[in-house]
Amino acid sequence: MIVFGWAVFLASRSLGQGLLLTLEEHIAHFLGTGGAATTMGNSCICRDDSGTDDSVDTQQQQAENSAVPTADTRSQPRDPVRPPRRGRGPHEPRRKKQNVDGLVLDTLAVIRTLVDNDQEPPYSMITLHEMAETDEGWLDVVQSLIRVIPLEDPLGPAVITLLLDECPLPTKDALQKLTEILNLNGEVACQDSSHPAKHRNTSAVLGCLAEKLAGPASIGLLSPGILEYLLQCLKLQSHPTVMLFALIALEKFAQTSENKLTISESSISDRLVTLESWANDPDYLKRQVGFCAQWSLDNLFLKEGRQLTYEKVNLSSIRAMLNSNDVSEYLKISPHGLEARCDASSFESVRCTFCVDAGVWYYEVTVVTSGVMQIGWATRDSKFLNHEGYGIGDDEYSCAYDGCRQLIWYNARSKPHIHPCWKEGDTVGFLLDLNEKQMIFFLNGNQLPPEKQVFSSTVSGFFAAASFMSYQQCEFNFGAKPFKYPPSMKFSTFNDYAFLTAEEKIILPRHRRLALLKQVSIRENCCSLCCDEVADTQLKPCGHSDLCMDCALQLETCPLCRKEIVSRIRQISHIS
């Protein structure tokens, strides 16, 4: 929800500022003097004396820029179509670095309060975004993120991702300048080992850029020096959090096939085999490293002779797990189906394999990371809109507990609860009482008052479900092992009543799943969405007819022309 609301605000603000600047230009022309227009513009904008004020003479900039062309484009807006914002002009003294640092820290301080799509982003985020519209400003923001985000804040890496993801794309010159400034190599990775925050933040920035610039730009960014730096950060002498984000950065670079080949040739799999043993480590930071190492070995950097984890994991006692067929695309699920992690910039969600319609049910979650996750209950009607920032608790068919921001979520609205912020190792309990139509949330055995809002929309068909912000991870217990804090009332567990075939328990690595999809033959007359049923339905009024009735009933607009669907007409009888 944070990312979506922020994007909407920026779009509307950009349009409004463009209109305002156009109006000022006409006023200046009418008055016949740039000075009068300048006075009017500056008097309307109140700023403090911190050096972040936007004292810009828009008309003077336009006059100077047109009169004195310059070859240096680093201080020019990147997008010539979008109207320039009121930012620092090309001849205004450079903002002091400590002011950029202050804006970054201010954003980190208020990020927990951004809970509503209708909520205006804080001034610090708006200002940082405006600064990043020039190459010089973008470089200042990136260097500040590396310099000042503290190691101990659980939302630090997520703030790096949030700010960079919403900033304008860097130019080729800006990327080149960044690599020159950082000057990364294996020796740099060994420096300042007693201050790991800088290396953690550097890896987080590189990973975010690799994800955002997948393709030729990502290939250019992965220089021999940067590859050497990231591989050196994976050595056992490094701090676990540095190892974690270096590995995540390498994963994101590997989204481009040429980079994947380059990284694989570096013998990275030999290092990951050692780190894989940390997957069940009692140290939750090492556990994250182990989880990501195992996932990379199974999905990206395959090692010859190594058996894939899903082929050797013991699932005999597991009868309910996270559903790998009911999950948004970037969520990582462990081979035993009980642990999930998100390293993408989107808000990833998943449901359990077992659905309940009556009775009293309970499950627990162990918090591995203490950042933003929304965990609770959802029906099949609850939508996963990961790129828009909507997850569990963001519609009328789900309700979620958020232990980081200390909120209960329902229908995209939140209310505070009295539990303290969760931390690594905490146990969150989720009780669903369909007899009394209530949900009860527990933190380490301490319960909150019952929640009943969701039952105004639905009374059955509930799944355990969760949504994850960037770099978050937790483990689910559906009853395959004893609960840490079982409630006092009588309840049932998923594992006692669910059933999965051996085939349904398998969570295939992505390359195996893709190989199977390539073997699937698709009939010419099949539905273009599900590729399973016959395309037997025509949409009115547009007339498109390449869908089955089941898929057509789930749509409000035509997926081809985006026209609203008024009616659906079945053209032929269903043929199996």
UniProtKB/Swiss-Prot annotation:
It comes from the Eukaryota. Glycans are attached at residue 314. It is found in: Secreted. Disulfide bonds: none annotated. GO terms for biological process: proteolysis involved in protein catabolic process. Its main location: secreted. Residues 300-483 form the B30.2/SPRY domain. Residues 83-97 have a biased composition (Basic residues). The keyword Secreted applies. GO terms for cellular component: cytoplasm; extracellular region. GO terms for molecular function: ubiquitin-protein transferase activity; zinc ion binding. A zinc finger (RING-type) spans 527-562. Keywords: Disease variant, Dwarfism, Glycoprotein, Intellectual disability, Metal-binding, Phosphoprotein, Secreted, Signal, Zinc, Zinc-finger. Residues 57-68 have a biased composition (Polar residues). It is linked to Spondyloepimetaphyseal dysplasia, Faden-Alkuraya type: An autosomal recessive skeletal disorder characterized by spondyloepimetaphyseal dysplasia, short stature, facial dysmorphism, short fourth metatarsals, and intellectual disability. This is RING finger and SPRY domain-containing protein 1.
